[in-house]
Amino acid sequence: MGLVTANTVGLSGLVAPKPNVQIFTATSGTWTKPPGCTRVYIEVIGGGGGGGRGESAGGNGGGGGAMARGVYDASALPATLTVAAGAGGAAGTTGTSYLGGIGGTSSVTGSGFTLQAFGGGGGCRPNGYDSGGGGGGGTSSAGARGTGASGDDSPGIGGGPTIQGSTTGDSLGGRGADGGEGPAAGKCAEFGGGGGAGARAASGGGANGGSSIFGAGGGGSGVRSSGTAGSGGAWSSYTAGGGATGLGSWALIATYTGTSRDYGCGDGGAGSPPGGDGGAPGGYPGGGGGGGHYANSDGGAGGRGEVRIFAW
């Protein structure tokens, strides 16, 4: 959830110095251990998957990025660490064959040290059929795309690790949540990203993106031709929806974009409403993008990843 940066009072009654806080949002960087520090806390969040473009059916949502974190003795870490914040998955457009991009991996690496969080799966091409949402990113692998074909609307599988009893439905530990099958909502996760919502070919509303307690929310799906678009999944929740609110009529995309935060993770973007301009981007870090509506509107881009390092 993030470390509080306010000064603290030690046992001696003296005010301790503020921790050294460094936030990385670019794809490459270097962290140098501050002199005198004894503890280091690290958070890494993978990029969100992009939402799928609609195609005679609503577009499906992208999966959210995972969160990984740890507290370390400063003496156990190398003097420098290489840092990479994963990019958000590209929006599904004609230029991407209607496919939303898979979110990038965020990592902190050094001699004998690795901490990673993987990105969410992108929305698939619906091809005029029901289609499955992108899987949420995990702490050992990225989420996968779902499928959209006659008789096959399978959801994208959440990223690893594989955890016994957590291969279907909502996930736990670092496993990413599965996307929604067909027009169903995305599944929820603990440290993995929430699953993107599945989309329907028939008329009717979209489905909600899956949420995550510590990871980022998945994107909602767009509508076929009428009804209310699916809402994005939320950070700090284990119930689908709760992120950007899906709407039932045209509005500016900014109205239903996922919430971004300087702590925790981002929420998923909502799907496109009827006549809308496309699915909304996911919030940063890690929110999945929303799906477009049936009339060939683009999906929303996934939220970028992020790395935060606190030393004191």
Regions found by a protein language model. Name each.
Residues A117, Y284-G286:
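Bulky hydrophobic/aromatic "packing anchor" residues in well-ordered structure
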Residues T114-G121:
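Short amphipathic beta-strand/extended segments with alternating polar/hydrophobic composition
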Residues V4, L77, Y129-D130, G134-S154, ...:
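Generic hydrophobic, helix-prone segments enriched in Leu/Val/Ile
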Residues G61, G88-G92, G100-G103, G122, ...:
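Collagen triple-helix signature
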Residues M1-Y41, V71-D73, E306-W312:
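Enriched but not universal
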Residues V21, R39, T80, T105, ...:
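A residue-level signal for beta-strand positions that form part of recognition/binding surfaces
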Residues I23, T30-P34, V44-G110, G123-G128, ...:
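Glycine-rich strand-loop-strand elements at beta-sheet edges
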Residues G10, G121-C124:
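Residue-level detector of flexible, active-site-proximal loop/helix-junction positions
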